[in-house]
Regions:
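Mature extracytoplasmic/periplasmic domains
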Residues: 263-323
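Extracytoplasmic ligand-binding site segments that recognize negatively charged/polar headgroups
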Residues: 35, 78-223
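Periplasmic-binding protein-like
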Residues: 134, 193-202, 240-264
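A ligand-binding cleft/hinge motif common to bilobed small-molecule-binding domains
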Residues: 88-91, 220, 225-243, 292
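C-terminal motif of bacterial Sec signal peptides marking the signal peptidase cleavage site
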Residues: 18-21
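Ligand-binding "clamshell"
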Residues: 93-100, 122-126, 237-248, 309-313
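Early extracytoplasmic/lumenal segment of secretory-pathway proteins
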Residues: 23-91
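Conserved C-terminal helix/tail region of periplasmic/extracytoplasmic solute-binding proteins
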Residues: 320-351
Length: 351
């Protein structure tokens, strides 16, 4: 997805943590286990947290929400803080796999933007604390795409045959088709889903490829000129190619959240609370945003601490009042099997 696990990054994390454990033979009094997306934290933050609190951070990474779920339900490993996305948080809450957070221990939660509190997947904000957020839209090459780009319909325009990239992702791609047709990206109406399937099958003749993170390089290099893209990736791509721009289509789109939660079987809840509170400090947030270029901080006042190319970006910091309707993915329960079937049919279809 938007955060691909990298061996080099994991090695860097291990090096930082091993170095912080060295010196004068001291051993931290406490430790916590954190499970997060790859390439999603500045390693220096972990070092600074340990230095300031004496709590050692054992840090591990995953590549998808599904990997996280499997680890939480089938592994003996116990984590104190994990960072799932919206729909997975909803599922974890339903299944009793996360605990309510004592927000009296998270005073920095007051720093979180009000618009990001009480999200649909945690409406009373009992279980989760925002980590990063963003949108899904279209990135396009202004020098090559002369039509106005403000609608998902551009991805079905025959003029751009073999220039269009779609995500190789069931929820993301079906979500685009559903929004284009005026439906919710969480639709459980099979008639609507059949319409979305039909439109995606018809579109296949125009598509350069269904790709994951590797689609970024294809667009930056100019081999394709239109692509569905996460805002965090889009800003980085725009810095690499000045001809690129990003828009959230007028029909609406996905607003995604990755948030910190504490698993039910956490071994060090107090340490987890300290870590979550630390991650909400403005200076810590600013450091992390600079490291993870393109992702948007949920904390008030961080924007002013960032370089001009980030803080002035309407991609990272859009005017929320001017955005089209946005919705986050929801856990669909057993109905996800219908999505699985339809996605398989789309992939197997011949034009």
């Amino acid at each position: 997805m938007k955060q691909m696990k990298k061996i080099i990054f994991a090695f860097a994390i291990l090096m930082v943590l091993s170095l912080t454990g060295c010196g004068k033979g001291k051993t931290p009094k406490e430790e916590i286990y954190v499970y997060n997306w790859g390439e999603y934290i500045d390693p220096q933050i972990l070092k600074d947290f340990q230095k300031g609190t004496g709590i050692k951070v054992n840090y591990d990474t995953y590549a998808s929400n599904e990997d996280l779920y499997i680890k939480m339900t089938q592994s003996q490993d116990k984590y104190d803080v994990v960072v799932p996305s919206d729909y997975m948080i909803e599922r974890l809450i339903k299944e009793g796999l996360v605990r309510e957070i004592d927000f009296s221990k998270i005073p920095n939660f007051a720093n979180v933007e009000d618009i990001l509190k009480n999200p649909s997947f945690d409406p009373e904000n009992k279980y989760s604390v925002p980590y990063f957020w963003g949108t899904v839209g279209i990135i396009y090459n202004k020098a090559e795409v002369k039509d106005k780009v403000d609608s998902w319909n551009i991805l079905w325009n025959e003029k751009y045959k073999n220039q269009i990239i779609m995500y190789n992702s069931q929820r993301d791609t079906l979500g685009v088709a559903l929004k284009r047709l005026g439906y919710s990206l969480n639709s459980t109406n099979e008639k609507e889903l059949q319409e979305a399937k039909k439109s995606l099958i018809e579109q296949k003749a125009l598509v350069y490829a269904y790709l994951d993170d590797d689609g970024r390089d294809v667009v930056v290099q100019g081999d394709a000129n239109l692509s569905v893209m996460y805002s965090g990736d889009a800003l980085l791509m725009m810095q690499q190619n000045e001809d690129l721009d990003y828009v959230v289509p007028k029909e609406g789109s996905n607003i995604w959240y990755d948030s910190m939660v504490i698993p039910k079987n956490a071994q060090n809840v107090e340490g987890a609370e300290k870590f979550i509170n630390y991650m909400l400090e403005k200076e810590v947030q600013a450091k992390n945003v600079k490291h993870c270029v393109g992702y948007t901080s949920p904390v008030k006042g961080v924007k002013e601490l960032l370089p001009d190319e980030i803080k002035n970006s309407k991609v990272a910091y859009p005017d929320m009042d001017k955005l089209p309707p946005l919705e986050s993915f929801k856990d669909l329960g057993d109905f996800i099997k219908v999505y699985d079937r339809i996605w398989t049919e789309i992939n197997a279809s011949n034009l």
